[in-house]
UniProtKB/Swiss-Prot annotation:
PANTHER family, A to Z: DIMETHYLADENOSINE TRANSFERASE (PTHR11727), DIMETHYLADENOSINE TRANSFERASE-RELATED (PTHR11727:SF7)
HAMAP family, per the entry: 16SrRNA_methyltr_A
Superkingdom of origin: Bacteria
PROSITE patterns: RRNA_A_DIMETH, SAM_RNA_A_N6_MT
Protein name: Ribosomal RNA small subunit methyltransferase A
Enzymatic class: transferase
Reactions mediated catalytically: adenosine(1518)/adenosine(1519) in 16S rRNA + 4 S-adenosyl-L-methionine = N(6)-dimethyladenosine(1518)/N(6)-dimethyladenosine(1519) in 16S rRNA + 4 S-adenosyl-L-homocysteine + 4 H(+)
Assigned keywords, A-Z: Cytoplasm, Methyltransferase, RNA-binding, rRNA processing, S-adenosyl-L-methionine, Transferase
Sequence positions that bind S-adenosyl-L-methionine: 11, 13, 37, 57, 85, 104
One Pfam family named in its UniProt record: RrnaAD
GO MF: 16S rRNA (adenine(1518)-N(6)/adenine(1519)-N(6))-dimethyltransferase activity; RNA binding
Family stated for the protein in its record: Belongs to the class I-like SAM-binding methyltransferase superfamily. rRNA adenine N(6)-methyltransferase family. RsmA subfamily.
Amino acid sequence: MVKAKKQYGQNFLIDKSVLAKIIQAIPKEMNNIIEIGPGLGDLTQELLKISQVKAYEIDNDLIPILKKKFQKELECGKFNLIHQDASEAFNPSLDEKPYFLVANLPYYVASHIILKALEDKNCLGLIVMAQREMAEKFCAKEGNSEFSSLGVLSAMICERKILFDVDPQCFNPPPKVMSAVMSLIKTKDFDELCEIENFKNFLKDCFKAPRKQLLGNLKTYKAKVLEVLSTLGLKENIRPHEICVDLYLKIYDKLKDEYGRKQRDK
């Protein structure tokens, strides 16, 4: 039995019923799937029944195991195994063709990889397993205390849903937290709405103290923020988690020149 490595945040999924539910949730028309962290290949095996698969694996010790297990699929070109850290492979895309991402993500890189995938124009959407708390942040709605910059970014371009929870006992070794599988299906790209790097910097400021008032977090631009809040009919003491995506875009529109200048001056 291969031992999971802590430095890669490995927890091997061993519950076959969870694998089946993940496969069932993948949109039927997806025929080019990318998997991050195939591990021992249990999910990969099921994915190959419905699509060609390109998998990114960082662990040296798992590469020969996967090559042996999927020798036929590798030889016929249905499976492509890349020995690389996937978080460094967005260059700018994980694949030259449109793809759908499926992954059991290590908790320590989950948010980074999901955001990279959302920014990747070739990514059509993703079904990923992550820490339940992380899934809640990506799928939260305005008004919910969990609504954060991650929720704003995903809501801008995706249909979002937490599909189901996954108990620690479904893994070897069992993690110390509850996991969840979420679906993020893209409906548009960021560049249809804004300049994403500047907008992310804006959101970082908006949520730097999430329980404080938005006006306090954006005090550098207090006069402009007061003006736009008044124009939009929003109260001055509104907090970041109470504002919907459309309103964030409208507030940003009044401040985008400031954030563009900030980026250029870096």
